[in-house]
Regions:
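Short helix-loop capping/hinge motifs at secondary-structure junctions, enriched
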Residues: 132-139
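Short, solvent-exposed loop/turn and secondary-structure capping segments
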Residues: 39-40, 89-91, 130
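Early extracytoplasmic/lumenal segment of secretory-pathway proteins
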Residues: 16-86
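Short, glycine/serine-rich, charged loops/turns that create anion-binding
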Residues: 11, 32, 133
Length: 139
């Protein structure tokens, strides 16, 4: 949890690098809010920055960002899979982030080649099969 909290803090601070002082931050996310709330609470305690979380369907959130344009309240768009990140990049809703911290800590396979998005986590996928029909060597 601490690594995720640190990385989230870095991303948030970098996303607002143009601001001199940050009092409040808005994250549009398709992740489950209950999974983010402990991280956000830690971030708030560590920095004093209030985080507003707007949760919803990824497609709807991207539409909202498109409609809001430059007036979007979203400082960060956080989603659950790389496919949505690709769609968001294609819609050009991301800005390039230049950060030595992210360059050092996020492997190239977990980020956009143009630094428009960075992966926060990765998941293992399992294959379930009938051992009556297949041998594990078949895979």
């Amino acid at each position: 949890m601490k690594k995720i909290s640190i990385l989230l803090s870095v991303l948030i601070l970098i996303s607002c690098a143009n601001e001199n002082e940050i009092d409040e931050l808005t994250i549009y996310t398709s992740r489950q809010p209950q999974l983010l709330e402990p991280i956000i609470e830690d971030f708030n305690d560590d920095t004093g920055i209030k985080v507003n979380l707007l949760s919803g369907n990824a497609q709807e959130l991207m539409e909202r960002i498109d409609i809001e344009g430059n007036d979007s309240m979203a400082d960060i768009f956080m989603t659950v899979d790389a496919g949505v990140l690709w769609q968001a990049a294609e819609r050009d809703i991301f800005s390039k982030v230049d950060s030595e911290i992210l360059e050092r800590n996020v492997p190239s396979y977990l980020k956009d080649p143009e630094n428009k998005w960075f992966g926060l986590s990765k998941r293992a996928r399992t294959i379930v099969f009938s051992s009556d029909q297949f041998a594990s060597d078949d895979f």
